[in-house]
Amino acid sequence: MSLVVADRMSAAIEAVAALGASAPAALAALHEFLDGGSVTQLSSVLGLSHSGTVRLVDRLGAEGLIERVGAQDGRAVSVVLTPRGRRLALRIRQAREKTLTSALSALTSDELDNLAAALDTMLTTVTRARVEERSADSHDRPQPWLCRLCDFAACGRSEGNCPVNNAVTTSDQS
């Protein structure tokens, strides 16, 4: 079932923005929490190599979706969304929301509550495993952030209710 939903979501995103697999995540990350971040930070979020992220940034820049902004000292370069990039990031999020809403529409309220509880448990397990993998891996292979496509308003991050952050915090305290 998860593959069906993932395939539908990918198709919906591709219909809105035929930019490949990593571009929607880059636009979402820049829109939600990383606007003005560096290529290195974006690379970390996406789980791409630095050179792969540079190529992605070049491609998104050529499409007029992002631009590089240099710092006053000329050393640091930030990646920011253009107004066009911001609009596309919102359309991508709306396509994802519509697809997910459609997939969940046949569930009753009780079924939705049960699914939410099960997904919360699964997310906590996956998040803790990811933290343990990163701690054990001395090479620190790039791994994409779990939140790279997150809608922060929906997850409750601004109120301190981000399930991924809570799982990591709980894991750190145990």
Model-derived features: positions:
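Charged, amphipathic alpha-helical coiled-coil/dimerization segments
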Residues: D58-D113
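N-terminal helix-turn-helix DNA-binding core of bacterial DNA-binding proteins
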Residues: S10-S51, E63, C162
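Residue-level signal for short amphipathic helical patches enriched in basic/charged
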Residues: F33, G37, A95, L107-D110, ...
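Generic structural concept
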Residues: S2, L27, H31, T82, ...
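Hydrophobic alpha-helical core bundles mediating ligand binding, dimerization, or RNAP-core interactions
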Residues: S2-I13, A89-L107, L115-V126, A154
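Residue-level marker of regulatory loop/turn positions in helix-turn-helix DNA-binding domains and
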Residues: L19, I92, H139
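C-terminal regulatory/oligomerization modules of transcriptional regulators
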Residues: D113, A117-S174
